[in-house]
Design a protein with these regions (language model features):
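Short basic helix-loop element that most often maps to the first helix and adjoining turn
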Residues: 11-26, 30
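Residues within helix-turn-helix
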Residues: 25, 36, 54
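Recognition helix of helix-turn-helix/homeodomain-like DNA-binding domains
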Residues: 32-48
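DNA major-groove recognition helix of helix-turn-helix/homeodomain DNA-binding modules
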Residues: 51-66
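Short, charged recognition helix plus adjacent turn
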Residues: 58, 68-79
Length: 79
């Protein structure tokens, strides 16, 4: 998976978290994820499972698509 995809996803997650005025710790609690994992997502270091994407979306009260804003489906994978 392209690192730019992970970075864009992480930036979106951070932007949405800050919009809700949540700390990483608060988001972690709401999404049932570890605070270190939230930090890794925001830095583009974590490749999330579908379940964790849904958890994050619910905790942020956003559409799943909002987390993928700016990510093109035509990007090639660089594994």
């Amino acid at each position: 998976m392209s690192k730019s995809i992970l970075k864009t996803f992480g930036s979106n997650a951070r932007r949405l978290r800050l919009r809700r005025k949540l700390t990483q710790e608060q988001l972690a609690e709401l999404s049932f994820l570890h605070p270190n994992y939230i930090g890794g997502i925001e830095r583009g270091e974590r490749n999330l499972s579908l379940i964790n994407i849904v958890r994050l979306s619910r905790a942020l009260q956003c559409r799943i698509g909002d987390l993928f804003a700016g990510i093109s489906t035509s990007e090639k994978s660089d594994n």
